[in-house]
Regions:
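Patatin-like phospholipase
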Residues: 1-43, 51-198
Length: 198
């Protein structure tokens, strides 16, 4: 049987369905595919799970993490958030979700503000997070080339900022939201980036 050599992994968004990625990662662990991965690109839920895979989370760790999550804690819509919608552009600030992401990052790396360049240096993986730049009306990949000193938790928060649900995120004076708005599965971008030939 021909062995599979996965070098570039692209993960789409999908809301709570993103939890299914831990099953994929279990299969990857069993087949020892993860050691050959050179880049991980993710949007929305794919950005969360792709980032955790990049920093070394195992299937068992991710499974325990998901089981411990209380999803209602990350989406708190109340009267005030509805009344302030015209100012905030979202019913939920995303603060609790960002705190959770930062905690996950710190537990594994020791640094909740680890940047794209530090991820590349420490784990030898090019992590890329897909976002929608609302200011420039275009899809972007945030990575160690475009945003080397950006903490990945901020990029993840931008990528999961579903329009009208979560407030958009400001990075370097540009306004960002869920990468899935313009390209939920940026596989063509990755193919062109690495000149992958079918």
């Amino acid at each position: 049987m021909t062995s599979i050599n996965i070098k570039h992994l692209v993960l789409s968004g999908g809301g709570l369905l993103g939890i299914s990625y831990i099953g994929l990662f279990k299969y990857f662990e069993e087949k020892n595919y993860i050691k050959n991965i050179q880049s991980i690109t993710g949007c929305s839920a794919g950005a969360i799970f792709g980032s955790l895979l990049a920093i070394g989370y195992t299937y068992n760790e991710l499974n325990s993490l998901v089981k411990s999550m209380i999803f209602k804690e990350y989406l708190k819509i109340n009267v005030d958030s509805i009344l302030n919608f015209t100012n905030t552009k979202g019913f939920e600030s995303g603060t609790n979700l960002n705190l959770f992401i930062r905690k996950c990052i710190k537990n594994k790396t020791g640094n909740e503000n680890i940047t794209f360049s530090q991820i590349q240096e420490k784990y030898n993986i090019k992590l890329q997070i897909g976002v929608t730049n609302l200011t420039k009306n275009k899809f972007e990949l945030l990575n160690n080339t475009t945003s080397p000193e950006l903490p990945i938790h901020k990029a993840i928060s931008a990528s999961v900022a579903i329009p009208f649900i979560f407030e958009p995120i400001v990075i370097n004076n540009d306004i960002y939201c869920d990468g899935g708005v313009l390209d939920n599965l940026p596989i063509d971008t990755v193919i062109n980036m690495y000149n992958i030939i079918d």
